[in-house]
Amino acid sequence: MNTKHVTCRYFLHGVCREGGRCLFSHDLATSKPSTVCRFYQRGQCAYGARCRYDHVKPCNGSVFYPPQEMAPAPLESTPPLLPTQEAAAPVTKSAPQRREKKSVVLRDRDLCGASVEKAHPDPALRPGCAADPPVSELEAKPHSYLEAICTGLDETPIPSAYPDAPQQLCPFAQAGGCHYGESCPYIHGNVCEICGLQVLHPYDQEQRGHHEKLCMANFERDMERAFAFQASEGKVCSICMERVYDKQSPSERRFGILSNCHHTYCLACIRQWRCARQFENPVIKSCPECRVISEFVIPSAYWVEDQSKKFELIEAFKQGMGKKACKYFDQGRGTCPFGGKCLYLHAYPDGTRAEPEKPRKQLGSEGTVRFLNSVRLWDFIEEREQRNLPDAEDEVAELGELFMHLSGVGEEPPAASN
């Protein structure tokens, strides 16, 4: 079925979203319904510029839509009466007196007098239209609820969605390139000598100083990392005799730095050494080469040899470990064997930190002093309960054999001599 000869009703209302792909006709010459707003010609359109119909003023000879409640008299048949004629005219009782209706004040005064101005030059004698009120009165009294709501909105400037757009730096130029070029509404900043990006505001000196300071700090940090990587590249582990950065797994490319020693070890080898149980505690805590005891091992991605930087690394390591809860203390439910020397957090469930216990001292017979951990009575009871006691039956059997041996039972008598 061909629908091109049928006028699209959505196009008549101005809301057809198909455009050129529409199957119906968009030719207004063949459309019968009028798209002219009748309420606008009456001066009563409340939609204003948002109306979907055409707001066209009627020309001379065009059809004028009067208000529905008004019934204007014909202009040619009944001439208007002058004030003197109205006074002399006889009043007849037979003629029904029609109640005079209130005239409608049009919003557009030119619209009211466009078709009647030539016939009735006097504004007071225009039919269907009252005398024009003063302009100030029209402006003071709104004609509809919509107009009353919108009063003053047209004069108020609409704030821009980007009030500081001319003062902002272009984010595309900061990232490396803006394809808008000179037509970009944002400012293209000056090029920073350190990072090489357009991030310096040409007018804001505070922003320029802040960025230069931040950029210089990042540059110094990157240079320190580059020097640290260069110093760590050729380090060889003293246990496995392999270069640390040449290991296959990236997780193994870390150094195990001893707190009191400067020998090089990879983290996996030195941890394996300190976890051995076949040696005494002072042996496994000491360096495999110089035998200097170190309390802990610090994992690091770079080798640190300077003593000041090593102290900074140790403090950062302690602060990081101090934020993790100790699994032996277990929020007060357990006992940590390391006591106050533990690097992990000893805190109760409410967040209160536990005070480190003072170590107990014991003086030996030879004058030596030993530090003891917390001693509890239950430890002695548990040790006694777990002690292997001799079986009573074994003791009875052993005593019986001893008694029989002493009494001479079971021994063969000596042979009689001939």
UniProtKB/Swiss-Prot annotation:
PANTHER family linked to this entry: E3 UBIQUITIN-PROTEIN LIGASE MAKORIN-2 (PTHR11224:SF17), MAKORIN-RELATED (PTHR11224)
Entries under SMART domains matching the protein: RING (SM00184), ZnF_C3H1 (SM00356)
Catalytic function, reaction form: S-ubiquitinyl-[E2 ubiquitin-conjugating enzyme]-L-cysteine + [acceptor protein]-L-lysine = [E2 ubiquitin-conjugating enzyme]-L-cysteine + N(6)-ubiquitinyl-[acceptor protein]-L-lysine
Name of the protein in question: E3 ubiquitin-protein ligase makorin-2
Keywords (A to Z) from UniProt: Cytoplasm, Developmental protein, Differentiation, Metal-binding, Neurogenesis, Nucleus, Repeat, Transcription, Transcription regulation, Transferase, Ubl conjugation pathway, Zinc, Zinc-finger
Source organism (scientific name): Xenopus tropicalis
Annotated spans, Disordered: 76-100
GO biological process: axis specification; cell differentiation; DNA-templated transcription; embryo development ending in birth or egg hatching; negative regulation of inflammatory response to antigenic stimulus; negative regulation of neurogenesis; negative regulation of non-canonical NF-kappaB signal transduction; nervous system development
